[in-house]
């Protein structure tokens, strides 16, 4: 069975209440349940992880090297600031898809810079909650050699 790690960064635990006009009304728990269900139907195991702390995300990536085949990451604000998460992803050699609920390229200038994009196998941005499901399809296709 293929094992995928879903990483959500800072403030994504507030989904459903934080700026619903941008991020929608679904909670992170709702998204994780729905994504896990879809993955299970495809014989994929998803491990969900969320942290507001950069070092915890780095540690999770390090701890996943031997058990995870692909990563889906919505790094939140760390997308624009974290060299340590970037380096952990590169060092892990685990293929990853960067994802965002909103279109980060149509927002404030500081959100247009990503420390992850050039190392990701792909980026999904701007499709709302569907970004998670599109990213899952992308990583599955990549890992199955359909890229």
UniProtKB/Swiss-Prot annotation:
EC number: 4.2.1.10
Gene Ontology molecular functions: 3-dehydroquinate dehydratase activity
Pathway of action: Metabolic intermediate biosynthesis; chorismate biosynthesis; chorismate from D-erythrose 4-phosphate and phosphoenolpyruvate: step 3/7
Catalyzed reactions: 3-dehydroquinate = 3-dehydroshikimate + H2O
Statement: the UniProt record of this protein carries the keyword Amino-acid biosynthesis: yes
Acetylation found in the keyword field: no
Keywords: Amino-acid biosynthesis, Aromatic amino acid biosynthesis, Lyase
Residues given in the record as substrate binding sites: 74, 80, 87, 101-102, 111
Complexes and interactors: Homododecamer.
Family indicated by similarity: Belongs to the type-II 3-dehydroquinase family.
Role played: Catalyzes a trans-dehydration via an enolate intermediate.
Protein known as: 3-dehydroquinate dehydratase
Source organism of the structure: Prochlorococcus marinus (strain MIT 9215)
């Amino acid at each position: 069975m293929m094992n995928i790690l879903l990483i959500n960064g800072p403030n994504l635990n507030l989904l459903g209440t934080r700026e619903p006009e941008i991020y929608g009304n679904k909670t992170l728990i709702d998204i994780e349940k729905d994504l896990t269900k879809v993955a299970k139907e495809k014989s994929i195991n998803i491990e969900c992880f969320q942290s507001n702390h950069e070092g915890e995300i780095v540690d999770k990536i390090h701890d996943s090297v031997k058990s995870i085949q692909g990563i889906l990451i919505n790094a939140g604000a760390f997308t624009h600031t974290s060299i340590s998460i970037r380096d952990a992803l590169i060092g892990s050699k685990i293929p990853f898809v960067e994802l965002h609920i909103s279109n980060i390229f149509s927002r404030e200038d500081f959100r247009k810079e990503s420390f992850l994009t050039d190392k990701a196998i792909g980026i999904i941005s701007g499709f709302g909650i569907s970004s998670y499901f599109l990213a899952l399809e992308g990583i599955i296709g990549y890992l199955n050699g359909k890229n």
